[in-house]
């Protein structure tokens, strides 16, 4: 059960990292790197001519979907929800996370995309899907 709780915690922590896109950025320092979590600069929405208000609304929807999907998966891992919710929860959370991270891409966000891809792969592997989750 400890492994299941740790994995559920990981899923929730990964989901909640996306809140950094709407949280205030820390103060910039002279030699510090730029804050990678920003909804003000999107290569995708800028090219499509989407305004900043709509861009932020789309980002909020993707953040909420990411948190919701990974929360369902975490509750499924702990046994609070049926195990059949595991794969759809991961798929919903990871796909919306990837969409957010690509739309507002910064090189540091590549790690998050990698995590999402691994979670999708793991959730659809026969050994860990459905009722046979062995985490």
For the regions a language model picked out, list residue spans one by one:
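Membrane-interface extramembranous regions
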Residues: 1-135
